From Swiss-Prot:
GO terms for cellular component: host cell membrane; membrane; virion component. Induction: Expressed in the late phase of the viral replicative cycle. This is Uncharacterized protein CP123L. The chain crosses the membrane at residues 5-25. Belongs to the asfivirus CP123L family.
């Protein structure tokens, strides 16, 4: 006759096998053979970005009517002033520039030109 410890171990093994068999049949009945989780769906792509429409933007803003009407003209005038400033800076005499801008923090004429061009690139 086997000892009590051996009987307990055999009973535990049989019990575990029964539970595993029961679990297997429950998963096959549900249509999921095995225990794999369902596959993860692929991520949905983001919606396409809407192209910027300046006229639509101006309609939505709460600017004054005069600003809405004239902003294009003012932008063109500002662009013309900036471009003429660049041309003026390129044609400016170095000695006249240094005489007019002493103590303004410019090391040389080329330094001032480079700073101004960097400023124009930013804005």
């Amino acid at each position: 006759m086997p000892s009590t410890g051996t009987l307990v171990i055999l009973f535990a093994i049989i019990l575990i096998l029964c539970i595993m068999l029961l679990f297997y049949y429950k998963t096959t009945e549900a249509g999921n053979p095995g225990v794999l989780p369902p596959p993860i769906p692929p991520p949905t792509p983001p919606p396409p970005k809407k192209k910027y429409d300046h006229n639509e933007y101006m309609e939505k803003t709460d600017l004054e009517p005069e600003v809405k009407k004239n902003h294009r003209k003012w932008a063109n005038e500002a662009e013309h002033l900036i471009s003429s400033s660049v041309k003026g800076l390129e044609n400016l005499d170095e000695t006249a520039f240094l005489a007019n801008h002493k103590g303004h923090g410019f090391r040389t004429f080329e330094h001032a030109k480079s700073l101004f061009k960097e400023f124009l690139k930013k804005y």
